[in-house]
């Protein structure tokens, strides 16, 4: 009679007054727990006999209530001599009664009866004493003031849960998220009820009519398909959010009215993104909608911030970052400034290569000393970043790159420092230096060796070639040729002089970023069609580049009007389409699961290319030619801590090597399959993918890899570039995991935001993970560098890798980290984060 035999059909009136079918198995289970709690064994037969006696006595009771049932259980237990069990059952009832009282008190104080069910679920899911709602009630009541509205009281309740979050009680951030979500959903439901709109199709129609949703969604999907998609929604996945993640999402990511009222739920946001990304899929389109929705809503994959924010909207600029090669001409420089302004207008970040621009004191049309140098132009870039501020939301973001042999380098390295002539400063740009192998080799072997800085325009004029167009041994040969040519003016310093300027700036400002140009180009899978001069704003992108070239300006007459037509050669204007695998939320050891997840993410990124709104035609042309994407990771430290792997250990190095090799394998496999289905990228022939050099350079010699190389040679690749690890500062907060490949800053800290203190807790912090979350500034950075070197073999582009130093680091120690990174093949270094230094996170590349 455990609930299946001799079932009695009755109804029971709950405490809220509602009548529901009586479930006798609940009594059976409650009594079983009471016996188990006393350490008393009881057979199913005897327990069924007690249950039968209870049911016999209840049969005559009408109406049946919860209290009547529980009273009868107590009486029957005592009649049969089970006094200790009955006592435990009574105490259990009293405890449950106390839990109900605190729930009811909180709900009554807020003025929201529907809150009771949310609080009941919280009590069920967070059973430790440290998460008692009595503590929440006390904190909440301390915030309550006479005259507060219901919304203000609900906000105070959420604030109380936020403030209870500590390193010892980290799960309060999940409780706070549930309370915030409940308040939001109540307001959201009222918004739509007030408009008389109930279903998803109606909401999308309203948002489309108001110009808040792209009309292309309803143009591509039928009413029936939208209804099917609504069935995919899983509101319970909102419980995966931390307070910080949900608060950020509601403020920055969901669609809002023009009066800043959120009009879609988190799950509707994920579904809207999925609908957009699957829009052009074929017969199994709704299947891909569900797969995209599931990977996003389960927080296993995050798309880049522009994709999360702008997919499904009228202006759907989905790309994170752009990279431009600045030409050495007035028209070219101002075109690049214009390009940056347009990119920034739509929320993109920018990388700009200034290595072709002539140095200060160089000639212009034969006039000696006429050129002002790169600093003047970079100051214009700085002012453009400040001026084009995305409707007042935030200013533009740009990294400016210069080669280590450029004659303006010393001034460039002081752009952001606090000393010197302020007319030569640009505090709102992020400088980065492109280093050849020769520079690091000399820094390692003979730091006092001479280093010659030259003007790229003079080299081109005298030698007939652009030195920056070469890399590796060919670059070294031509560099020495220029050094030995007396016709070229040199600014001769020592390697030590440059190193000192670099390190001083890095420690003081966190920049310049480092770009190891020979390491990048040596491993470039598309070196057959060009070269890579620099990276992007966050140093994870490494793709072929070429400047936009002016061809002609002609005057025409069209329909009686005089028009001026300017023709340009589009060059290669790099675009970054990013997403990240949330390693802390994924079963990385499950190869089949990871392959399916990577396949889904690769397909979503490939679709971004065709569904994107491009701020520039140059970007669209390059993106369609190479179809480059950048799948990265977040939650790296989270992944290690969950598995009990210490950062400073050989186990860490072996684990990351295996994980990233399989991610790369899954990505290449998925991309080749996509090429078979949809076609290969235009420049596949002659690439390292096609020749097999990609696999040889990385030492992929196993049978599995050889078979994949053969498949790639036959089927091709859909995308020219695949993997790039971005910093993920914002989207890692959304998914409740650690940022990018970085170690955590602290296990727990308070962050000030708009006058209040927000708790930040390491993901899944517990006694099991506590000792594996070593703070970034306490970690021996050589372990981070070695891990980055192992990962780099499996990443065809680059990684946003930071170095964390303290005031105890000497300049020599910092230099050793740079040298070690170069030796192990790390392509780029992002910030040098000194413990006393606050640096800005990149929003655009957050994926």
What are these regions (language model features)?
Residues 88-95, 102, 172-204, 435, ...:
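Terminal amphipathic helices with adjacent charged low-complexity linkers/tails
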Residues 18-22, 42-45, 110, 261-264, ...:
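Alpha-helix capping and helix-loop boundary segments enriched in small/acidic/polar residues
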Residues 23-41, 115-129, 271-278, 739-744:
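Short, surface-exposed, low-complexity cationic segments
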Residues 222-230, 234, 238-247, 539-543, ...:
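Catalytic alpha/beta core of large soluble enzyme barrels
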Residues 189-283, 366-380, 392-396, 401-536, ...:
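Conserved, charged catalytic cores of large soluble enzymes
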């Amino acid at each position: 009679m455990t609930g299946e035999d001799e079932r009695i059909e009755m109804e029971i009136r709950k405490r809220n007054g509602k009548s529901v079918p009586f479930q006798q198995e609940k009594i059976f289970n409650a009594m079983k727990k009471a016996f188990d709690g006393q350490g008393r064994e009881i057979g199913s037969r005897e327990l069924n006999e007690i249950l039968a006696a209870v049911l016999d006595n209840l049969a005559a009771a009408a109406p049946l209530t919860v209290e009547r049932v529980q009273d009868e259980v107590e009486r029957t237990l005592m009649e049969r001599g089970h006094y200790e069990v009955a006592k435990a059952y009574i105490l259990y009832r009293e405890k449950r009664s106390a839990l109900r009282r605190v729930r009811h008190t909180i709900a009554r104080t807020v003025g929201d009866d529907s809150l009771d069910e949310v609080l009941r679920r919280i009590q069920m899911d967070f059973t430790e004493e440290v998460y008692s709602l009595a503590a929440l009630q006390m904190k909440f009541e301390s915030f309550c003031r006479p005259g507060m509205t219901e919304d203000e009281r609900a906000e105070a309740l959420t604030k109380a849960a936020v403030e209870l979050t500590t390193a010892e009680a980290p799960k309060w951030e999940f409780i706070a998220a549930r309370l915030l979500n409940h308040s939001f959903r109540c307001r959201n439901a009222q918004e739509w009820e007030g408009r008389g709109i109930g279903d998803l199709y109606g909401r999308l129609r309203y948002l489309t009519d108001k110009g808040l949703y792209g009309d292309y969604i309803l143009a591509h999907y039928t009413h029936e398909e939208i209804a099917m998609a609504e069935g995919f929604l899983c509101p319970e996945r909102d419980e995966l959010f931390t307070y910080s993640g949900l608060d950020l999402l509601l403020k920055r990511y969901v669609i809002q009215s023009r009066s800043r009222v959120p009009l879609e739920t988190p799950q509707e946001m994920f579904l809207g993104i999925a609908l957009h990304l699957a829009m052009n899929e074929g017969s199994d389109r709704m299947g891909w909608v569900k797969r995209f929705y599931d990977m996003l809503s389960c927080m296993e994959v995050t798309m880049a911030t522009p994709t999360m924010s702008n997919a499904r909207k009228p202006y759907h600029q989905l790309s994170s970052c752009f990279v431009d090669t600045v030409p050495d001409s007035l028209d070219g420089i101002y075109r690049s400034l214009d390009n940056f302004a347009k990119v920034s207008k739509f929320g993109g970040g920018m990388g700009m290569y200034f290595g072709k621009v002539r140095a200060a004191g160089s000639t212009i049309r034969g006039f000696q000393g006429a050129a002002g140098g790169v600093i003047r132009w970079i100051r214009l870039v700085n002012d453009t970043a400040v001026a084009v501020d995305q409707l007042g939301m935030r200013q533009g973001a740009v990294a400016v790159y210069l080669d280590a042999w450029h004659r303006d380098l010393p001034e460039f390295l002081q752009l952001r420092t606090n000393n010197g002539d302020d007319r030569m400063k640009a505090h709102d740009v992020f400088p980065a230096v492109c280093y050849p192998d020769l520079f690091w080799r000399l820094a390692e072997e003979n730091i006092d060796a001479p280093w010659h800085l030259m003007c790229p325009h003079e080299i081109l004029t005298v030698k007939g070639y652009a030195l920056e167009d070469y890399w590796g041994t060919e670059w070294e040969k031509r560099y020495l040729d220029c050094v030995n040519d007396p016709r070229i003016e040199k600014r001769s310093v020592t390697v030590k002089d440059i190193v000192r300027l670099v390190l001083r700036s890095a420690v003081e400002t966190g920049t310049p970023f480092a770009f190891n140009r020979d390491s990048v180009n040596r491993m470039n899978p598309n070196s057959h069609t060009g070269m890579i001069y620099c990276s992007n704003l966050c140093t994870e992108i490494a793709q072929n580049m070429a400047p936009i070239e002016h061809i002609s300006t002609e005057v025409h007459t069209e329909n009686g009007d005089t028009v001026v037509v300017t023709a340009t050669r589009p060059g290669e204007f790099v675009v970054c389409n990013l997403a990240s695998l949330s390693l802390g939320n994924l079963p990385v050891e499950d190869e089949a699961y990871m392959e399916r997840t990577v396949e889904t993410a690769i397909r979503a990124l490939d679709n971004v290319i065709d569904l994107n709104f491009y701020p520039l035609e140059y970007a669209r042309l390059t993106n369609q030619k190479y179809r480059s994407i950048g799948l990265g990771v977040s939650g790296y430290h989270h992944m290690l801590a969950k598995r009990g792997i210490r950062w400073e250990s050989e186990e860490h190095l072996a684990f990351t090597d295996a994980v990233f090799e399989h991610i790369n394998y899954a990505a290449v496999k998925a991309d080749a399959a996509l090429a078979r289905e949809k076609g290969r990228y235009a420049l596949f022939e002659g690439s390292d993918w096609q020749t097999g050099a990609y696999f040889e350079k990385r030492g992929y010699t196993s049978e599995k890899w050889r078979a994949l190389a053969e498949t790639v040679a036959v089927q091709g690749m859909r995308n020219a570039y695949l993997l790039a690890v971005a910093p993920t500062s914002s989207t890692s907060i959304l998914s409740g995991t650690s940022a990018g490949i970085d170690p955590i800053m602290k296990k727990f800290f308070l962050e000030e935001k708009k006058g209040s203190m927000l708790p930040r807790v390491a993901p899944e912090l517990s006694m099991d993970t506590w000792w594996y979350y070593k703070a970034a500034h306490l970690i021996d950075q050589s372990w981070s560098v070695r891990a980055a070197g192992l990962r780099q073999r499996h990443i065809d582009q680059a990684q946003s890798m930071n170095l964390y130093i303290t005031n105890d680091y000497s300049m020599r120690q910092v230099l050793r980290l740079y040298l070690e990174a170069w030796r192990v093949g790390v392509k780029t270094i992002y910030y040098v984060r000194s413990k006393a230094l606050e640096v800005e996170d990149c929003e655009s590349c957050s994926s």
